[in-house]
């Protein structure tokens, strides 16, 4: 099955899964946890339909974006190749995020059902899964970024990286590596660190990867601009 078809299927799967799962949940379930895994909000089980609806909308939007990104009326073969490359990257992003949120939704439903019947409910498992998922997602997206070509839709996009094709190539190669490293460290944190720290570690590492990549993009921009003097 081609990536784009699987990605489309994946955007609808969370909705079907949730509709089935909700039949087995009590009417009132945990719907929110703080960063320590403690339940701080209860509500209707139908609240869990929000994420699948958002995923459906995002899936349709991203699918249309990928389709438009891969087609052009130009006869320039190089530009067409760049557009097709970016379309594949977008499809990969849709696939990766779809897998992440599908897994997250499944765990949220499982934890909600378990905690609704537990005398000492906890969201510790959910925190680890979120951190682990974010780490794996970062690794996957980090591998995709260097495959993108200069555009305004996907990749490490800022004014400095958009300066030239070379600035884009170098910035996205470095940014991809930074994401991979932060993702691997996040996975380790999700496995080894206390639950209360797992998501914080993921957020801190992602922020550091972004800051370092921005600094590198600025450096590359200056180097590229200096060549024109």
Which residues fall in each region the model found?
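Feature 926 captures the class I aminoacyl-tRNA synthetase adenylation module centered on the KMSKS loop
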Residues: 1-229
């Amino acid at each position: 099955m081609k990536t784009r078809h699987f990605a489309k299927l994946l955007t609808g799967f969370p909705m079907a899964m949730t509709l089935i799962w909700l039949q087995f949940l009590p009417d009132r379930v945990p719907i929110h946890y703080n960063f320590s895994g403690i339940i701080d909000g209860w509500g209707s089980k139908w609240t869990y339909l929000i994420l699948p609806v958002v995923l459906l909308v995002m899936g349709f939007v991203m699918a249309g974006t990928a389709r438009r990104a891969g087609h052009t009326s130009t006869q320039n073969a190089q530009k067409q190749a760049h557009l097709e490359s970016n379309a594949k990257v977008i499809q990969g992003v849709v696939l990766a995020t779809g897998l992440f949120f599908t897994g997250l939704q499944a765990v949220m439903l499982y934890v909600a059902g378990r905690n609704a019947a537990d005398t000492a409910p906890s969201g510790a498992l959910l925190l680890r899964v979120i951190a682990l998922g974010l780490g794996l997602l970062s690794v996957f997206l980090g591998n995709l970024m260097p495959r993108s070509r200069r555009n305004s839709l996907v990749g490490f996009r800022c004014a400095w990286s958009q300066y030239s094709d070379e600035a884009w190539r170098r910035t996205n190669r470095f940014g991809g590596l930074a994401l991979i490293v932060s993702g691997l460290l996040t996975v380790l944190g999700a496995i080894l660190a206390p639950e209360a720290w797992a998501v914080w570690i993921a957020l801190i590492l992602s922020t550091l990867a972004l800051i370092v990549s921005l600094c590198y993009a600025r450096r590359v921009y200056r180097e590229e601009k200096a060549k024109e003097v």
